[in-house]
Amino acid sequence: GVLGLAGSRVTVHGAEHAVGPAIFANNHSSNLDAFLTIWLTPRGTVGLAKKEIVRYPFYGQAWLLAGHPTVDRGNSEKARASMRALGDWVRDHGFSVCMLPEGTRSRTGRLLPFKKGIVHLAVQTGLPIVPMVTVGAVGSRDKGSFRIQTRDIHVHLLPPRDTPRG
């Protein structure tokens, strides 16, 4: 992938937990996290990103071409409606979802508070949550730069957590 071309090594731990349908929840420390998360999850996984991603060169076009949904974080009514529609679609089609539940990138690598959308989606769909932890990606791509820094990145997929269906 892109990270390999940049000289980065990605080591995956717990790959046996990459089974869907599920909600894959990864921490957010790099602009590459969404693509890394989707790459490591089973076929039939859609990602969810803020609507502004479409303005990012390369990322936005790739996101749209892949058919991944976006959410308007600035309008809570629209955000809730799009999350409900996503939940219905995922449940009806047997797909998985990958999310970065912090909702924004951590500049330090420290975990930020989670947004509520992941809980609502899990309860609506009844899908288990597979926690993912990416270590080493902080600073892999500086803001405003297209250059990917070489890193040793470790991604840990943890055992799924069942969620009650609402």
Where are the regions that the model predicts?
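Catalytic core of membrane glycerolipid acyltransferases/transacylases, capturing the structured
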Residues: L3-L5, G20-S76
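Short gly/ser/thr-rich secondary-structure transition/capping motifs
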Residues: G4-V12, R80-A81, A137-S140
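Generic preference for hydrophobic
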Residues: V12, F24, G47-L48, V155-L157
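A cross-family acyltransferase "interaction/gating" segment
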Residues: H17, F58-Q61, F95-C98, R107-G166
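Short glycine-rich anion-binding loops that position phosphate/pyrophosphate groups of nucleotides
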Residues: H28-S30, E102-S106
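Cofactor-binding loop segments of dinucleotide-utilizing enzymes, especially the Rossmann-like FAD-
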Residues: K50, E102, T134-V135
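Anionic-ligand binding region
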Residues: K78-G87
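Non-transmembrane, membrane-proximal soluble domains of secreted or membrane proteins
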Residues: A85, R91-H93, R110
